Amino acid sequence: MPELPEVETTRRGIESSVVGHVIHELVVREPRLRWRVPRNLADLADGQRVQQLRRRAKYLVFDLERGSMILHLGMSGSLRVLPRETPLLVHDHIDIVMDSGMCIRFNDPRRFGCLLWTEEDPMTHPLLKSLAP
C-alpha cells in the first residue's frame, strides 16, 4: 500500500498537470474498484477546471468548479502523467484527460483503490471527516 509520503509525492508529481486545467474527458474502463465508480462521474467532471489538488491522509482530493473527486490509491494503485495516446497496460482503469492533451492514468492491479464524487465539502465526506491531515 502506498504510504503517506508516496501519496504526497504523487500529489506533488501530478499537481502541475491538473491544477488550472480543464478535464476534457474522464474515461472509466473498469468501474468495479473498492467502491463502484459513479456511473455519471464523466458527466459530472467533464468540462470542469481543477481548482486545487489536496491530500487528506492517503486520499487525494481534486477540487473542481462544482464538486470534488476523491481518489485513494488502494493497495497497489498508481497515477501516471502520460500523453493520451500512450498504450494501455492491463490494469489501467481510469484516464483523466486534461485540456493540455496529457492524461492522468490510474492503474490498480488489485482494484482496492477508489474514485468517488461529492458536491459537498469533501472534508465532511464520511471517508475523510475523521482523518488527520
Regions found by a protein language model. Give the residues of each.
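Phosphate/anion-contacting hairpin/loop surfaces
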Residues: 69-133
